[in-house]
């Protein structure tokens, strides 16, 4: 069938809390504490790679992505830390989960397209979602990436009216899924929640 599915994912269970803890250490100017938490989180994800993927190709592809991600997190331990940096750190939870699921689905033979929510999810100056902007940008992006069975993107994260990384605050990924459903005139929106590990799909 020609049915297309658009999947919006949250961060993996416990990840957002860990990223907030890492941010707390950085606010308190404790890079050692932050690095300990970053290393622990990286080890957790590397263990998931071993169980999630069946081929060495996809294990290595995902490990390589994760190494880059966690090095990016470590880069925050060297600079001034503000709420802007915190939002960038917290956004990585969704970026990691969507990349891992996209790799998994590709390995399973699905024709998958991973879209970056930061390219189309935006709030206005009142910190409310900007539905016209979202519809216009997402329509353009979907037109550029036609012919996939499954589209995957991040829930919760967005850019604000000034183009800075931000988040939708309330409702998280469910809210993102609803906004995307409206923007694309989706036939239905299914919200799945299950706090166990990788099943946090909305």
Question: Where in this protein do the model-derived segments appear?
Answer:
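Nucleotide/pyrophosphate-binding catalytic subdomain
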Residues: 1-202
């Amino acid at each position: 069938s020609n049915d297309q599915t658009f999947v919006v994912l949250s961060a993996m269970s416990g990840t957002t809390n860990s990223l907030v803890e890492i941010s707390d250490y950085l606010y308190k100017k404790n890079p050692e504490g932050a690095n300990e938490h970053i290393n622990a989180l990286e080890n957790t994800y590397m263990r998931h790679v071993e169980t999630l993927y069946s081929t060495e190709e996809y294990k290595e592809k995902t490990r390589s992505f994760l190494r880059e991600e966690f090095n990016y997190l470590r880069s925050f331990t060297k600079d001034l830390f503000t709420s802007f940096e915190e939002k960038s750190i917290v956004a990585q939870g969704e970026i990691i989960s969507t990349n891992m699921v996209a790799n998994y689905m590709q390995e399973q033979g699905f024709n998958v397209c991973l879209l970056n929510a930061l390219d189309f999810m935006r709030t206005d100056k009142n910190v409310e979602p900007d539905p016209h902007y979202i519809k216009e940008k997402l329509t353009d992006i979907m037109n550029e990436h036609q012919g996939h069975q499954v589209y995957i993107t991040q829930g919760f994260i967005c850019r604000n009216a000034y183009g800075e990384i931000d988040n939708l605050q309330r409702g998280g990924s469910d809210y993102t899924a609803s906004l995307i459903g409206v923007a694309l005139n989706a036939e239905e929106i299914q919200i799945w929640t299950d706090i166990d590990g990788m099943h946090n799909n909305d």
